[in-house]
Amino acid sequence: MADATPGAEYWTALGWQPSTEQVDQLATLQTLLREWNEKVNLTRLVEGDDYWINQVFDSLWPLAHELKTPHQPRTCIDVGTGGGFPGLAIAIALPGSHMTLLDSVGRKTAAVEAMASRLGLADRVAVRTERIETTGHDRACRGQFDLAMARAVAAAPVVAEYLVPLLKPKGEALLFRGQWSEEDTTEFSSVISPLKAQLTGVQTCQLPAKRGIRHLLRVQPIGSCPSSYPRAVGIPSRTPLGS
């Protein structure tokens, strides 16, 4: 028996009405995640609301603007994709996008690559197995993305250093956060200035079923990111900007 998929209230709260095919893909992704989780420790958020709210909803709610133009061509990268979120959910929701999934753990990238293939996304989902500090200096990636995103990876200044070098001049970095305050905004806006970037917006969402408050930071370039960023492997996390 197939797992139940969310009802109309869920999609209304998300502000997105997926096609039947997209709902089927998201349901299939749950099944694939469950299968791969038996081989590789990808995530504990696989069943019921853990999957549909904490994985799918939490991946898509910040993209209300982008979901209005799903077929618009976009180059996207999900840094530290882990079990494939938010990247695979966004690739399903934005069929015009080309998504790169990045993780330094080969077992995880092998799993998400296999899942993308089973979902019929292989033609527009690429997978890279390497540290983001290396990716940020690769000509194939540096300055090449419309959207660069990271969810549950590291402190915000660290994530900004990972993402900003990947952006096109008019691209955006999407930093998925849990708790966030006005004090955080003030401090973060200051520490990212060496990246030649600015915080352009903070979005807030109360997840359904009282699953907690989430925030999204949108960061855009205001100039060319200096070639010294990201710093060498391990340094951004050991010595975050502003520390």
UniProtKB/Swiss-Prot annotation:
<feature type="binding site">
    <location>
        <position position="151"/>
    </location>
    <ligand>
        <name>S-adenosyl-L-methionine</name>
    </ligand>
</feature>
<comment type="similarity">
    <text>Belongs to the methyltransferase superfamily. RNA methyltransferase RsmG family.</text>
</comment>
<feature type="binding site">
    <location>
        <begin position="132"/>
        <end position="133"/>
    </location>
    <ligand>
        <name>S-adenosyl-L-methionine</name>
    </ligand>
</feature>
<keyword id="KW-0949">S-adenosyl-L-methionine</keyword>
<keyword id="KW-0698">rRNA processing</keyword>
<comment type="function">
    <text>Specifically methylates the N7 position of a guanine in 16S rRNA.</text>
</comment>
<dbReference type="GO" id="GO:0005829">
    <property type="term" value="C:cytosol"/>
</dbReference>
<feature type="binding site">
    <location>
        <position position="80"/>
    </location>
    <ligand>
        <name>S-adenosyl-L-methionine</name>
    </ligand>
</feature>
<dbReference type="Pfam" id="PF02527">
    <property type="entry name" value="GidB"/>
</dbReference>
<dbReference type="InterPro" id="IPR003682">
    <property type="entry name" value="rRNA_ssu_MeTfrase_G"/>
</dbReference>
<dbReference type="GO" id="GO:0070043">
    <property type="term" value="F:rRNA (guanine-N7-)-methyltransferase activity"/>
</dbReference>
<protein>
    <recommendedName>
        <fullName>Ribosomal RNA small subunit methyltransferase G</fullName>
        <ecNumber>2.1.1.-</ecNumber>
    </recommendedName>
</protein>
<dbReference type="InterPro" id="IPR029063">
    <property type="entry name" value="SAM-dependent_MTases_sf"/>
</dbReference>
<feature type="binding site">
    <location>
        <position position="85"/>
    </location>
    <ligand>
        <name>S-adenosyl-L-methionine</name>
    </ligand>
</feature>
<keyword id="KW-0808">Transferase</keyword>
<keyword id="KW-0963">Cytoplasm</keyword>
<keyword id="KW-0489">Methyltransferase</keyword>
